[in-house]
Amino acid sequence: MTDGLPERFDVLVHPVSELRGELRAQPSKNYTTRYLLAAALAEGETRVVGAATSEDAEALIRCLRAWGADVDRVGEDVVVRGFGAHPRAGMTLNPGNAGAVARFLMGVAALTTDTTFVTDYSESLGRRPQGDLLAALERLGARVSSRNGQLPVTLSGPVRGGRVEVSAQRSSQYASALMFLGPLLPDGLDLRLTGEIKSHAPLRQTLDTLAAFGLQARASADLTRITIPGGQAYRPGRVLVPGDYPGSAALLVAAALLPGEVTVTNLREGDLQGEREALNVLRAMGADLVREGDRVTVRGGRPLHAVTRDGDSFTDAVQALTAAAAFARGTTTWENVATLRLKECDRISDTRRELERLGLTATETADSLSITGADRIPGDLTADGHGDHRMIMLLTLLGLRAEAPLRITGAHHIRKSYPLFFRHLEELGAHFEYLPTDAA
């Protein structure tokens, strides 16, 4: 592996007294996914500058190659020669455990015939709901077969486009999938989002991506209606992937929990990633956090206090911020986060259980998680990473402040979004032991 770690491993997190140093934020997972797909939908060559190297990115690249794109890593960039509006028919695609990749590709699969989606992660991605997207594609005229709205799924076009509704109650990814498809349809797309929209920020990232590739799209202020003219073409070119706020939030929380000073660069101030709000939440909790342009510095060790926040806009930072809540005075509540139950694991119930295992008090409702802070965590036990990269980040941060080492199972799943997470923390002064395992 490029990180120099075992293929599969548990990690033993040792407590540390301080963290200090400067890191460049890893490339955004969300933007890498969007830019690579858009590049494949363009005819011609696109350079995606500073693309992520996560398992999700690699899963997408494999699928795009199967569909006929020529994709090459050149240093830190990815060069894509796309298939335009004509991905290969009759292919079987395996998006690994990448939910956004699977959904975006399912939308585009309406340009093909007999594209089948499978996964090796039957207990994770295989259980995640796809029915709302599949129903919208059927309403557009696609032929769809699935296992009760879950993978495996087979899709066939063609579709012409027009007006269609899609539920945004469970995920905004369904709408994004249709938005990537829309410009290539003869009649375009008049997309109506129904239900309470979850995660506005990713929808704005998709609109931003379409604009970067020369496409026209109009959206109402509340994003309930998105209109995309048909007969357009994705324009190849050069796009720069911004820094990743969800992963960087974990670094900044770690910095806040321990004495020292940590700076993370490459965090664009006006970025559309919703997890940018994590910086404001951390500051509201009492962290000494200062921004200078794209540089964010945290001077750690200050006492933190509890907050109550609607977490819908920064769901991918909730686990990292939960580590801050675990040591904050009072009870922190993340509200309106029901979508966390539909991730790689149930990030509400599974988080509560892991916090209780560590001696903390946590409670949950259908759409909220509350954490009562403590002065200390004993450590000296094994926590379950639940095969979830965000859970692994949370548990790692807790382990850095524990009184004795904390073992986390299945820590190799960190590679889904942040392959260098442990290595970056080591650069700041953390100490880990990597324990090879045969477990999946």
Swiss-Prot record:
Its EC number is 2.5.1.19. GO terms for biological process: amino acid biosynthetic process; aromatic amino acid family biosynthetic process; chorismate biosynthetic process. The active site is at residue 316. CDD domains: EPSP_synthase (cd01556). Pathway: Metabolic intermediate biosynthesis; chorismate biosynthesis; chorismate from D-erythrose 4-phosphate and phosphoenolpyruvate: step 6/7. Phosphoenolpyruvate binds at residues 29, 99, 128, 173, 347, 390, 416. SUPFAM superfamilies: EPT/RTPC-like. It catalyses: 3-phosphoshikimate + phosphoenolpyruvate = 5-O-(1-carboxyvinyl)-3-phosphoshikimate + phosphate. InterPro entries: Enolpyruvate_Tfrase_dom, Enolpyruvate_Tfrase_sf, EPSP_synthase, EPSP_synthase_CS, RNA3'P_cycl/enolpyr_Trfase_a/b. 3-phosphoshikimate binds at residues 29, 34, 171-173, 199, 316, 343. It is an enzyme of class 2 (transferase). It is found in: Cytoplasm. Keywords: Amino-acid biosynthesis, Aromatic amino acid biosynthesis, Cytoplasm, Transferase. Its main location: cytoplasm. GO terms for cellular component: cytoplasm. One of its GO terms (molecular function) is 3-phosphoshikimate 1-carboxyvinyltransferase activity. Catalyzes the transfer of the enolpyruvyl moiety of phosphoenolpyruvate (PEP) to the 5-hydroxyl of shikimate-3-phosphate (S3P) to produce enolpyruvyl shikimate-3-phosphate and inorganic phosphate. Belongs to the EPSP synthase family. Monomer. This is 3-phosphoshikimate 1-carboxyvinyltransferase.
